[in-house]
């Protein structure tokens, strides 16, 4: 399956949505050892605005700012929001984009790409240090999405997506 994304292709169908619009992403302050300011965690996702956009032929582009019950805005990790939204929509597939090839057995060798990981493999791969650094939250989001019903997740290198003018 090939992901083709081009601003030129979706410009007329893109619809910007913000998670705080109509409390689409209801959030709360992230509970952490260090105060991270206005960083939030998702309490609830209301999918109606997304479903309405999709049903009307639009491609929703969602800013991952959530809102607390008190009206405070919170920044939500984009991968976390994508995983939660995908599961709430009962999506078949979640695609996360990154700036690296993917999960590598040797982080310095792109030829060691691990093409598939099962949820049950994740603890071992973390313990072995293969899942580390910035890949930890991406893999955790994929695991969470699968546990919440998304059938398949993919982490793709954004540089592999060819963006060009559409054929006219």
Give the location of each predicted region.
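Single conserved hydrophobic/aromatic residue that forms the stacking wall/gate
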Residues: 1-5, 10, 161-167
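N-terminal glycine-rich phosphate/adenylate-binding segment common to multiple enzyme folds
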Residues: 6, 11-16, 23-24
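Active-site phosphate/oxyanion-binding loops
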Residues: 20-59, 63-155, 160, 164, ...
């Amino acid at each position: 399956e090939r992901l083709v994304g081009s601003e030129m292709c979706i410009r007329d169908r893109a619809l910007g949505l913000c998670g705080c619009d109509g409390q689409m992403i209801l959030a709360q302050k992230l509970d952490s050892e260090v105060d991270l300011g206005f960083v939030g965690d998702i309490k609830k996702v209301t999918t109606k605005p997304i479903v309405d956009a999709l049903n009307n032929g639009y491609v929703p582009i969602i800013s991952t700012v959530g809102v607390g019950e008190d009206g405070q805005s919170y920044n939500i990790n984009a991968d976390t929001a994508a995983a939660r939204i995908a599961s709430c929509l009962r999506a078949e597939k979640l695609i996360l984009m990154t700036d690296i090839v993917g999960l590598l057995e040797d982080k310095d060798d792109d030829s060691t790409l691990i093409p598939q990981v099962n949820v049950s493999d994740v603890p071992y791969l973390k313990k072995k240090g293969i899942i580390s650094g910035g890949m930890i939250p991406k893999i955790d989001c994929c695991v969470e999405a699968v546990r919440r019903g998304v059938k398949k997740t993919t982490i793709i290198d954004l540089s592999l997506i060819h963006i060009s003018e559409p054929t006219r």
